[in-house]
């Protein structure tokens, strides 16, 4: 009996997390179909799990980045520039794909939904201003509000200052980052329970009946995200690593995308991505900065959402769109997507900004936003899964490419 108990504990603490998550997913679906009340009650597990991830993510980013910068050795590469370049290329490519799909399969909307009572940003300048104001945020305020741009700036600044500190100070910071990482691993082991609760409560609260009226729009949105995840991202990774990209892409989708799909929060998924980067044996100096940065500005899914819904409004109103305007929309959607994390309501509240390019009134644009909230149970989940998994994919691609270059140099030096 004791042996069976120890085996069960061993499976819970060291078993395959992906298999456990799939079990939690299946159990959540079964519970929601059997008892709505029990499923709603199980939602507490999901709320606690997402809350725990959101609680630990800001301090994890602060400590990891600060420790990484403070202990950085002179001449050691961090690879941030090439990773940032891939983030921007990926987001713009996603916006282009969304334009192409919207032209090939135009969606129309019944614009009679009640406008959401939220004020969207008035222009790109306001979005960029919000992003820049995040940089100069009070550090305590940044930690409390999970402002990752502000946290990154303070972490890098403190890390640079601590470079001049004593060895014991640097060791203390490094030990503190390891301690926070250990807490994160414990939280992540509760993912199966969290996803069980999230799935059960979501199905019990909404079901999927409300989504059938927007089936065509959802097919274009999710089809675009799948195309980016399974075709565009692998092409970008192949261009970088010059080998089969699918083992890396599929692993990131499985281990990062699945969790992000159910938590629906890029910030909450930062600890999951950090742990995956550690498992992939990537350079900590690179991923400790690139992952939280990606959670803020790498928004391929948001670019697709903004573009598809804006063009759905355009098609509904019978407005003609030429190639030049479509390209401009891709650029605008990419810039908006990069600022989506700094806007309450995320990508949906940036749709009026894209609609304004076509002279669409704010009243109609906010009705499009209301449609976005209706389909959000799937749209937001798929968007977050694409955004978050892409952070790891591009970070890993750059790190692996740099490792391959170093190995080649060493081989040539030995000849």
Swiss-Prot record:
Pfam family, any one: SDF
Protein origin, superkingdom: Bacteria
Keywords: Amino-acid transport, Cell inner membrane, Cell membrane, Membrane, Symport, Transmembrane, Transmembrane helix, Transport
GO biological process annotation, one example: threonine transport
Protein location: Cell inner membrane
SUPFAM superfamilies found in the cross-reference section: Proton glutamate symport protein
Role: Involved in the import of serine and threonine into the cell, with the concomitant import of sodium (symport system).
Name this protein carries in UniProt: Serine/threonine transporter SstT
UniProt source species: Pectobacterium carotovorum subsp. carotovorum (strain PC1)
Lineage of origin: Bacteria, Pseudomonadati, Pseudomonadota, Gammaproteobacteria, Enterobacterales
Gene, per the UniProt record: sstT
